[in-house]
């Protein structure tokens, strides 16, 4: 029988890890091809925004691990 609580928490962590991968890839693109991103003339600000998004998703994973997976 599937434990719904554990399944929901696992899926939330998978979702946040996907967001981290997405924003990490965006940073890599900015670092390797900054001239290819026409709508972002301020590459540093764009990278900062991506890193903030990574930090938010990482923090949510840490909250799940600390508050909901410890029994």
Sequence positions of predicted segments:
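Extended, charge-rich alpha-helical interface modules
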Residues: 2-71
């Amino acid at each position: 029988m599937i434990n719904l609580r554990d399944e929901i928490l696992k899926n939330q962590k998978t979702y946040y890890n996907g967001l981290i991968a997405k924003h990490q890839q965006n940073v890599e693109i900015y670092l390797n091809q900054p001239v290819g991103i026409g709508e972002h003339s301020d590459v540093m600000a764009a990278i900062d925004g991506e890193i903030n998004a990574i930090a938010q998703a990482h923090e949510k994973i840490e909250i799940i691990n600390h508050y909901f997976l410890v029994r």
